[in-house]
């Protein structure tokens, strides 16, 4: 792995080669250590045919930081990779490709279509895993799993069969979210609530055998054909006399009852609600309470079926809507139409308006499974980070409904249920198992269920199916429960809760000890990133760079709303006039870590990435300096540490303790702050400068100079190890160069033990001395700058009011002061000549100005400056003393003027101080 450290830091040159070496070395594998202490993360499996988006990049970077940290800490780490078959998403992609050729899946038939999907999976399934490699992810690739692998498919069957045999899985007719385009039930996660401006139609319903009438309001007039009741509040005096009477349902020959139910809000609208149990989730629950018939009026493609009058049969739902409104108006039963803001449930993949639809599906009794999963969090067996997310979890779990697990798709795990001609269901591993289990003779025809499982069903088994369950494998015993789940808040219910339920039920233990919930990455304006907004950033583009033309093409191709193209192009050109620079994987990873705060929303700005690329560059250049000054030095015990050496070791020690603490609390943002401060502000800006001075100082002994070289080398090694989990590529490259100077070098930095803090390195006195030195040097530099003394010019320094501690610090650091503040002589004198003076921690620093500055000319210049500032102070004071201005101007304008006044007054005081210092 030895490589030259180039003059310039170029991420592209180092990243690919390093990754290939890591993967070839087998260092990512679990079981590489005898340690009984394990650390396991299950990668939330991304869609097999997908590509890496910002959320993936963000979460994968955080997972990799945890894995690399624990691996270097000596634990047996398993990061289990894999991909999800993503039923609906993948089937839609392949269907679109076939449709472009004029072929439907029905033309091919199920078997041939599924073969086509497998072909597509093999063709494009490697994209996301290659992108994971590009970002530096280090999972155990030899254990990669796919949710449709045989082992995982067998686990899905075993799980369902057990649930069925235990009475927790059943087939029933219930209301589901139905996508008429896909002709399948979809999960709540795949429902987008889209804001639309619609209408509210008020219809008149005549009461049977009476002159009375009731007015109801609806946003979906066509559903009135499926009404089974009208509900009123039991305490609504306007209607109590009507409860139990019948309504002549217009446009039909049916009568429906008037019922009383607490669900109805008396004060909303007319206080009367039409009840359509087969086409509304709330109505469905009320229908069950009142034993109302469930009349389905739609087919699976959302046309009206034979349960409606013949006039409406076969009409599309929206055509039927128009016809119903027209017919009600013709009968004089349309009271009024009002504009109404709606939230329309829409399929997030198809854009189709979804329908609550009554259909036979397979369900899992969720309340039974939820109870132990709730208790596990209540008892503290699982910790949510941040803690407040457990409230979201509890809210969902305590109000859980039975889970519809069947989907009307062809791609996925087919439900292991068979039916005879009478419709009886038989559940088993395969047809032979079913016949044996239920004693079915060969002449009894049975047919397998056409449906597949909801993708979340197989995903819920991921923490243990990937480890070999239902077999009791050594891996299952060793790595379950896992250590932490890193995921987004949007799938706490859909995935986290279901893994908890299945983990508790099938493994009798929680699937993970910690659940770290990340925020949502938004753009620099705080907007959610979406293709339709044209503000999506691709992590790989941030790593490798992309031209403006390519970025525009990427953002405007295949838009759902082509009219947005011009707006997207304009915004993109404004934000990225030159395209996106290549920042490298390390800078992108460091940015992700820096953004991982406790916030729910995270604004991503490429300026941050650029800043962290500069950080990497700073580390690279400091490392080059170290190598260039070590010559043939190799770490040895023949050294003596000076005050600056002890200081940087002590600072490193504190930073090391802080990093461990922050990682234990998942405060990645604080980890980056700590490492950034250590590297940039302490090692590079100060210690490297001290080292330059010390190595040129002929008065130092060989042992003392060895102390500097030892510290330069070993502190750099520790910095590289500390930072490696965050910025693995650059730290590996520098380590390979540093190895020549180490006496205990490893093949790769991944084998270096993660640094730990130790009391022996604490040096509070050295820290005090160097803080004192930094204050003195910084003050002297500022003083020189104030009066325009050239940086290259060496000057004298007179010190006054010198306490014993100051003398001690001066003795320890005099060489550094002289070199870093360009001082040629330090004199003790309590009556200095005309000087520029500053007091630092009680010590008076004086720079004699004779021969350096024309004092009279400088005073004249400062007088002019004072006159200008006084004019500004007077002008603003006059404005603020004007009562009319203060009472009439906006608060912000008045506040701005007050700020100006404070600023000018401060500048005036400082300038006057400068003048007085000249005597």
From Swiss-Prot:
Keywords for the protein's UniProt record, in alphabetical order: Aminoacyl-tRNA synthetase, ATP-binding, Coiled coil, Cytoplasm, Ligase, Nucleotide-binding, Protein biosynthesis
Residues binding ATP: 531
Alphabetized InterPro entries for the sequence: aa-tRNA-synth_I_CS, aa-tRNA-synth_Ia, Anticodon_Ia_Val, M/V/L/I-tRNA-synth_anticd-bd, Rossmann-like_a/b/a_fold, tRNA-bd_arm, tRNAsynth_Ia_anticodon-bd, Val-tRNA_synth_C_sf
Ranges in coiled-coil conformation: 849-919
Subcellular location: Cytoplasm
Disulfide bonds: none
Pfam families assigned: Anticodon_1, tRNA-synt_1, Val_tRNA-synt_C
GO biological process, alphabetically ordered: valyl-tRNA aminoacylation
Motif 'KMSKS' region: positions: 528-532
Cellular component, GO annotation: cytosol
Enzyme Commission code(s) on record: 6.1.1.9
Gene Ontology molecular function: aminoacyl-tRNA deacylase activity; ATP binding; valine-tRNA ligase activity
EC supergroup of this enzyme: ligase
Placement of sequence motif 'HIGH' region: 46-56
Catalytic activity, as annotated: tRNA(Val) + L-valine + ATP = L-valyl-tRNA(Val) + AMP + diphosphate
Superkingdom of origin organism: Bacteria
HAMAP family in the cross-refs: Val_tRNA_synth_type1
Free-text comment on this protein's domains from its UniProt entry: ValRS has two distinct active sites: one for aminoacylation and one for editing. The misactivated threonine is translocated from the active site to the editing site. The C-terminal coiled-coil domain is crucial for aminoacylation activity.
Sequence similarity: Belongs to the class-I aminoacyl-tRNA synthetase family. ValS type 1 subfamily.
Function comment: Catalyzes the attachment of valine to tRNA(Val). As ValRS can inadvertently accommodate and process structurally similar amino acids such as threonine, to avoid such errors, it has a 'posttransfer' editing activity that hydrolyzes mischarged Thr-tRNA(Val) in a tRNA-dependent manner.
Subunit structure: Monomer.
Name assigned to this protein: Valine--tRNA ligase
